[in-house]
Amino acid sequence: MNVQAHMSGQVSNQGTMSQQNGNSQMQNLVGGGSAPATGAGLGPSRVSPVDNDILKLRQAMRIRIFNILQQKQPSPADEASKAKYMDVARRLEEGLFKIANTKEDYVNPSTLEPRLASLIKGRQLNNYNQRHANSSSVGTMIPTPGLQHSGGNPNLMITSSGDATMAGSNNITTSAMNTGNLLNSGGMLGGNLSNGYQHSSSNFGLGSGGNMSSMSSQRNTGQMMPTPGFVNSSTNNNSNNGQSYLSVEASNNSGGFSTAPMMVPQTQQQQLRQDIGGQNSRMLQNHGSQMGVGLRPGMQQKLSNVSNSSINGGVGMNAKSVDSGTSYTNPIRNSQQAYDNLQRSGMQGDGYGTNNSDPFGSGNLYGAVTSVGMMTNTQNANTASFQAVSRTSSSLSHQQQQFQQQPNRFQQQPNQFHQQQQQFLHQQQLKQQSQQQQRFISHDAFGQNNVASDMVTHVKHEPGMENPSESIHSQTPEQFQLSQFQNQYQNNAEDRHAGSQILPVTSQSDMCTSVPQNSQQIQQMLHPHSMASDSVNGFSNLSVGVKTESGMRGHWQSQSQEHTQMSNSMSNERHIQEDFRQRMSGTDEAQPNNMSGGSIIGQNRVSTTSESLNPQNPTATTCRNGNGNRDPRFKNQQKWLLFLRHARHCKAPEGKCPDRNCVTVQKLWKHMDSCAAPQCSYPRCLPTKTLINHHRSCKEPNCPVCIPVKAYLQQQANARSLARLKNETDAARSVNGGGISSDAVQTSAGAKSCTSPGADISGHLQPSLKRLKVEQSSQPVDVETESCKSSVVSVTEAQSSQYAERKDHKHSDVRAPSKYFEVKAEVSDFSVQTRPGFKDTKIGIAENIPKQRPVSQPDKQDLSDVSPMQETTKVEKEPESLKKENLAESTEHTSKSGKPEIKGVSLTELFTPEQVREHIRGLRQWVGQSKAKAEKNQAMEHSMSENSCQLCAVEKLTFEPPPIYCTPCGARIKRNAMYYTVGAGDTRHYFCIPCYNESRGDTILAEGTPMPKARLEKKKNDEETEEWWVQCDKCEAWQHQICALFNGRRNDGGQAEYTCPYCFIAEVEQSKRKPLPQSAVLGAKDLPRTILSDHIEQRLFKRLKQERTERARAQGKSYDEIPTAESLVIRVVSSVDKKLEVKPRFLEIFREDSYPTEFAYKSKVVLLFQKIEGVEVCLFGMYVQEFGSECAFPNQRRVYLSYLDSVKYFRPEVRSYNGEALRTFVYHEILIGYLEYCKLRGFTSCYIWACPPLKGEDYILYCHPEIQKTPKSDKLREWYLAMLRKASKEGIVAETINLYDHFFMQTGECRAKVTAARLPYFDGDYWPGAAEDLIYQMSQEEDGRKGNKKGMLKKTITKRALKASGQTDLSGNASKDLLLMHRLGETIHPMKEDFIMVHLQPSCTHCCILMVSGNRWVCSQCKHFQICDKCYEAEQRREDRERHPVNFKDKHALYPVEIMDIPADTRDKDEILESEFFDTRQAFLSLCQGNHYQYDTLRRAKHSSMMVLYHLHNPTAPAFVTTCNACHLDIETGQGWRCEVCPDYDVCNACFSRDGGVNHPHKLTNHPSLADQNAQNKEARQLRVLQLRKMLDLLVHASQCRSAHCQYPNCRKVKGLFRHGINCKVRASGGCVLCKKMWYLLQLHARACKESECHVPRCRDLKEHLRRLQQQSDSRRRAAVMEMMRQRAAEVAGGSG
């Protein structure tokens, strides 16, 4: 029987009829062609009452949509417009009907408009007008049941005629024995096709003639209906392995291949109708494509395996592209599981195509991606027989399996098939209602428009084939519209003669529903003011195949001339083709079988058409049942994400990347890095940022964009895991024989081979990933393997147990760190295992990014002669014939793996084997975690899976999310709470929900600037980042970077060789290597020493020795038996001069008293390191402020202990001789040593605010361990006081008092005035901020704005009380001062003990000034009475009753004590130590938060400390240090050449390689690169610091210089940058490189600038911004203190009650 297929998807002519031969076939075609119009073959109407109700509901929905359209218009519509709106409404309703999951979803009015917007934005809406009835002869044949099918001719020849009218005879001559020989009976192609095109010996009824439809096909059986109970077995043996047999059993002989489903008798077809629909539009899953795939013997394929796929664009089984480089042979173990998965997916409406990559025994192996005769996607084929040429091209649907191609949208001439189209649409509606009422969704293949992209498939010209364009009728010319959303990549197969190789088949039906009408039209209709046009030359992807011959190109060109409306698109295509041809260096496009030529049929190209790459509306979808990832728009977004990765860190010199658009995307990155504009007009900025933000936070398990991207990254990351299997020794030998064994590598579903790896999409500060490890998604990902821009070929995780049991074969989730990190998707060689008895083939993989791999491995072959856009494999027979990768220029400093030998990429390289083992043991102790968590993690050691880290034995570990604070109120946004955000980088603002709701109107204030609420993005604070992974280059095992002590910053672009600890131990013990010397990686001891650090260290070591002696004596042991703290290092890592500006309101009160406007001080950071398990761990840190003798009163000679922090990892954990913890003893000694140092330098007092951090927050070290509890304020205060008591015993501290008693009270004989002007004014202290708030409240009370009478009454009472207390001057500022002190005292009094004043020198009892010179007059009787010289003179002038002691008759004698040994000058003799990361506490905390340098466990503390030391030894190299004299661009480290004679002549690598520096008379030498240096060296660090200082000096000079011919080096260059900054329209926020670098320098300058009237541009603005950040931090700290005090008061009240 001949089953004719129609566009409607129905099965027509079901009745029994004979298949006619020859031209009589036209009778069937004509008859079939009338079916859509007349309903013939459909039977009576099956529209039930339910259908009528649905029709009424749909009509009501159309009217509702029509009304919405009318309401969106600014003016009333005329009749013509109304008709247009109704037509649009009809099309929109059809789209809504198709995407609705349930009836409730369909009618839901609350989501109607969003769904409409999604349809409009997510689809080209003109595809419904492009469906046409097709009465082609593409009928699937049901073979006669019960007869065995055999064949003996391995070389199948078929007719390749597109129609009988073209060749006169279209018969398939069948012998009486039905041997399956397909004889060429003529045809328009003039001969048999290439030997490689394999056709099944399909059984035709005896005497039926076996009419075969038009084109050659890999499998006819893919469309045949399976007949249960009948097995088509083969009678041939191995000699026939070129012949394809139809058998569903896995037990057929080695010459046969299980390729076809079983046949279904006619009696069952009606039962299948609902599931199958049109047989020509749906195909059964041809699962058992290779021999021995492992299907259950005799198992019938379930009906749910029906593929619901449109036959569009020549992709019969699959509307997607088919990868040409991966074998899809199923492993035995998991084949049934995969089979069942396919069944489940099919039941969900997720069609799968045939998987029939059939190996020939000795011929060419063509997967379903081989090219075939007709240009199905580019020509009109057989219009005599194809009465309507639709998206379905002229080939058979199963032939579409042979193409690797993308869906095609053919735009017909407007009125050509109007009648058939309308009939089809009506028929389509009837079918949808009758077939799928239960699901309320249409699964009909032709009811789906799964094309949103106009792909042009160019097919390779085969020998003996005519150019099909010569035989194409012109009645229905197809127009190729390259729309702005066209960005599909396309892959065609590359035919090969040599060696039997497998090219893959993957197919999957596309369930997405397009919406008719042009999207821009409707968008303009709905949102007439929101349409923004973009450049026609926007970035887009265009599928470009290899041109076959010039005649073919001429045909395309003639077509473009014939269709004038498409001239622009075709012009673009020709331009792209020409460009692509130029890229194809060394490839032979005209040769069909060019194994060695490197010809590529499916190429990936990013062209400059329109803005089709714009990933707009990344989350909008019009797809059903999770099949949205087959939507071409989602594929666009996937490819855009991956191309963004490539461009981020493309290693090619600028302009040298094989993809010319790489530069464009790099500019886009640079723009987005600082772009904060909500409606940025920069091309592709907004949609790209939207896509990136979605990808960053995507948690959807079925996300059609992110899941395939992650799957691709998984494929790349795990490719090396498949490289070294146990047959690696046979890897160089080629495959010899027919089949692929059942344990061959199967590419996992969802492996998208897309653009080359590059940078992660997010951020800047993150360390680079050596390799990215991605967890295999739990749901089936898109089965297609797409060829994308600059893609590489690799194989995803194998499903066989053989691979799954390998512990070095892992995957895990990728959580791209939020800032700066690089991604290296490692691509390796992989081994395709053949069936037993055959040798392995080692297939090399082309690494496609220039300069990605420095040197090729000697035993591995890199396909550098292949275009970077090619995705294919080659059988490597002669390694010496293949070129090395064009990556690195030098082979020096490389390892055996071909990677640069960068020393110290992991700190374990410095360890001895025993230290490595100790480190691993320490990892599994989980020090820092609670007991329960530690035990849980330790238990995982006994159940390590393949995904577990080989060091810590745990699979998935996530970082603590950094805290987020509300900009207006400063409150911390809680975990999992919603918030709003806007901006980027330092200018990002956050708004908590209460602040957002309290802000009325359309704007909200952020730091005084109104922000439109429309710009705010609502988010949830639930982001998680997984720990990074790294893979050993030796054993391929995966470890956490933190466990491996891997320094991503030293990874040299992802290419540094990494050896895991286990391999390292083995190599050391086998004497293959030695541990690096300790000096190879600079540590804490290598940091600069200062007088302060030496003083504290010497004191600490001395006291530890004394403590150890005391402990030995107390315990009755010898000195050596007592454990003590060892390997301690103290360093000052930052020592810079700063200025503290007095807050304006406070300054206003004391302006008449000549109060200083600013205070100069020196900020210092002191850190303590201890070597624990071989790693120097930062355990303790403190920030101090030193106000010297040159500082104005009241801060003169004062020290403020600003912040102090520690983590509880100190070793050993023992008690000291006095009972306190040894760690406490050490920390106390550090503080006492610092106070002693301050006293020796002449400082008189130290101020300490004993304020513990708020729960969940940190002062210096980010993320404390769970085992370390945050102390209460009283505990912390006692900790400080215990330290001060020790210092008092040693005579270092003279007196300890609190701030309130010293400055707010006049006790005893104190004669000092109570005024706020006496209070020491410190940066970040409690009272200056609190005073500013109080002054503001007082000013509001005076103005009557707040409290009115109540406020005035309170002020009056306060003044009266002050007057009664003896205060007489209550006017003006004096009154404000007294009121301020009164209210401030009320605020401070409850917590006065927390504000500790430490006097290092005696203070005068009368004036309270600390005495540093002259004499102090001491009372002979009173112990604590002493006054200064000035007060003594005043004392002598007083009357006797007012002299000391007051109110006593007997007066005491005073005698002088000379004050000695106090330096007059407190100036620091240490050098300035600058560190941008330690400049402020917040800067260091931000560094740690942004890079996840956490201290919550010892393992993380070790890694974090290692990275902190790296940053300290490698300060950021300043910009403009080295500039190319030719192109005037900056030269990165190791990327340039320097003249040995001229002091300032440098050229970059690009300019040097272009002209070789021939224009310069002297010799040029290459700059040293990171790989050429040892791990680090001090001289380089000092040089960088010196260069940075010079650059900052230059910045200050240039801002003041007025000379046009200044001789100051580079002065004119900086002035030019100033001028550029004034005129630049892009700015730093827009991505301007010069502006960004200038901005960086300005920020460095502003942090260090002490000039209040600085002339450097933007200096004041930057300082104001920093001030606001500090103010927010201080406000949070004060708020935390007040909350603590309220809780304390509540506790006291509750206790007393």
Curated annotation (Swiss-Prot):
Residues 17-28, 202-217, 399-439 have a biased composition (Low complexity). Zn(2+) 1 binds at C1404, C1407, C1428, C1431. Zn(2+) 3 binds at C1524, C1527, C1548, C1551. Zn(2+) 4 binds at C1539, C1542, H1560, H1562. Its main location: nucleus. The keyword Zinc-finger applies. InterPro entries: CBP_P300_HAT, Histone_AcTrfase_Rtt109/CBP, TAZ_dom_sf, Zinc_finger_PHD-type_CS, Znf_FYVE_PHD, Znf_PHD-finger, Znf_RING/FYVE/PHD, Znf_TAZ. GO terms for cellular component: nucleus. Its EC number is 2.3.1.48. SUPFAM superfamilies: FYVE/PHD zinc finger, RING/U-box, TAZ domain. GO terms for biological process: regulation of DNA-templated transcription. Residues 1-16, 385-398, 556-571, 584-628 have a biased composition (Polar residues). It holds the Pfam family PHD. Acetyl-CoA binds at L1204, D1205, S1206, R1223, T1224, W1279. Residues 1081-1517 form the CBP/p300-type HAT domain. Transmembrane segments: none annotated. It catalyses: L-lysyl-[protein] + acetyl-CoA = N(6)-acetyl-L-lysyl-[protein] + CoA + H(+). Residues 1-45, 202-221, 385-439, 555-574, 583-631, 843-901 are annotated as: Disordered. A zinc finger (ZZ-type) spans 1399-1462, 1519-1572. It comes from the Eukaryota. SMART domains: KAT11, ZnF_TAZ, ZnF_ZZ. This is Histone acetyltransferase HAC1. It comes from Arabidopsis thaliana (Mouse-ear cress). The lineage of its organism: Eukaryota, Viridiplantae, Streptophyta, Embryophyta, Tracheophyta. The gene is HAC1.
